[in-house]
Amino acid sequence: MSLFDKRLSEIHSALRAKEISVTDLVQASIASIKEHDGEIKSVLHVDEEGALAHARQLDERLVKGNEELGLLYGLPAGLKDNLVTKDIRTTCASKFLANYDPVHDGTVSKKVKDADSVIVAKLNMDEFAMGGSNENSGFFPAKNPWNTDYVPGGSSGGSAAAMAARHFYYTLGSDTGGSIRQPAAFCGVVGLKPTYGRVSRFGLVAFASSLDQIGPVTKNVEDSAYVLQAIAGHDEYDSTSANVDVPNYLSALTGDVKGLRIGVPKELIGEGIDPEVRDAVLAALKQLESMGATWSEVSMPHTEYAVPAYYLLSSSEASSNLARFDGVRYGVRADNAANLIELYKESRSQGFGQEVKRRIMLGTYALSSGYYDAYYKKAQQVRTLIIQDFNSIFADYDVILHPTTPSTAFKVGENVDDPVKMYLEDICTVPVNLAGLPAISVPCGFSKNGLPIGLQIVGRAFDESTVLRVAHAYEQTAGFYGRKPEWVRG
């Protein structure tokens, strides 16, 4: 077994016993990127010098033995490139920010450092987190490690692909409409979206502020619990951060689901779901049933409106958030502008990619005078109805379970010229963001052509513990834990 296949708890034991060093781990991470990332292109920037220097400092602390070690001690990590990191380039995979080096850490970046993790690299993504395939990266698209003819998903495609390739012990992504869970499903890894407000967004470059949430991508559920433990909690720098207690997530991993009540929305298990995906999810339900859980079919009647409501709301918020990228304060600055208005126009035209421009235009239109009530206001009303759908189910059930995605990963270029088709791939994930709930994607099978299938488990607000408990119990008995592409080391 490769070092990078071991659980975080096993690695900590090896580090404390001085069987390996943090420097060994970081060097192995960097070597993996150099040797294998040329084809999957999950990594944008490697901070080799800074990561090795940090590793040596951590090794020295262990030798001295007079300091308590952090929860993520010594673990090499990769962060999605929209998480601000001091002195490590942060571009959001956009040419607009191609040379942007932040002068401070975001809260989550600081928390993983405070937990003694080593940030090795920043990871590929769809530009400004807008996309579901990583084909919208302003630099180059990432590929799926299971088959590079296929997309890794998005927008956190680099985070999921890098995890499947075992470049790191964990990665971090952001999830606005499924951007952690969908690529996790496509790449056969675990992706957790916490409750909105559970993890600080300070230092996350905003796409849609009422939807964005940071979360971990890992190779197993236990590791996700470790990482969430380190990054969760109230933050005075984020006004939307929830001031609620953070439980011990590791204590929730009991393996017990006896008496658990599972609701399965008929709208997300029937028509429009690939038969192979449906069969894998039904097999997962049968597995949980054999462990003492019960399940029933339920209804989320407003699901069909979730995708249009999501794209109206997220694009409206994006058009506001991205107004700050104007060529004046930072980023691309056009050279050929005759006046200030021309500077704004030319800088944004040169710096933003096609999908970002499309969503800015859609959002600006939805917010414009005469259309606000017809589009934005109506989308907010649909959001309320979707929240009510979830509340109705959770009155009788502990979790909701359904596919993470309607199909397995699609081929590179397959949907690139059809944005509506691309948007509809989000049907299983966007309702969770609209309601602000926690959800996890765990591997539950493979298609006939060898591509991973993801199972999504949704919980009540701030009940990540139950979500993790169910996911962990299933993972331990399902037989898919530890599977990785054949070429990956170990």
Swiss-Prot record:
Q: Which reaction does it catalyse?
A: L-glutamyl-tRNA(Gln) + L-glutamine + ATP + H2O = L-glutaminyl-tRNA(Gln) + L-glutamate + ADP + phosphate + H(+)
What Gene3D superfamilies does the database record attribute to this sequence? Amidase signature (AS) domain
**Which E.C. number(s) belong to this protein?**
6.3.5.7
Give GO MF terms, alphabetically.
ATP binding; glutaminyl-tRNA synthase (glutamine-hydrolyzing) activity
EC class name: ligase
Listed A to Z, the keywords are: ATP-binding, Ligase, Nucleotide-binding, Protein biosynthesis
**Active site as annotated:** K80 (charge relay system), S155 (charge relay system), S179 (acyl-ester intermediate)
The UniProt entry's GO CC annotations, sorted and at most eight, read: glutamyl-tRNA(Gln) amidotransferase complex
Q: Name one GO biological process term.
A: translation
The record's HAMAP family line, in alphabetical order, gives: GatA (MF_00120)
Q: Which NCBIfam families does this UniProt record tie to the protein?
A: gatA
Q: What does this protein do?
A: Allows the formation of correctly charged Gln-tRNA(Gln) through the transamidation of misacylated Glu-tRNA(Gln) in organisms which lack glutaminyl-tRNA synthetase. The reaction takes place in the presence of glutamine and ATP through an activated gamma-phospho-Glu-tRNA(Gln).
What family does this belong to?
A: Belongs to the amidase family. GatA subfamily.
Description of how the protein assembles with itself and partners? Heterotrimer of A, B and C subunits.
Q: What is this protein called?
A: Glutamyl-tRNA(Gln) amidotransferase subunit A
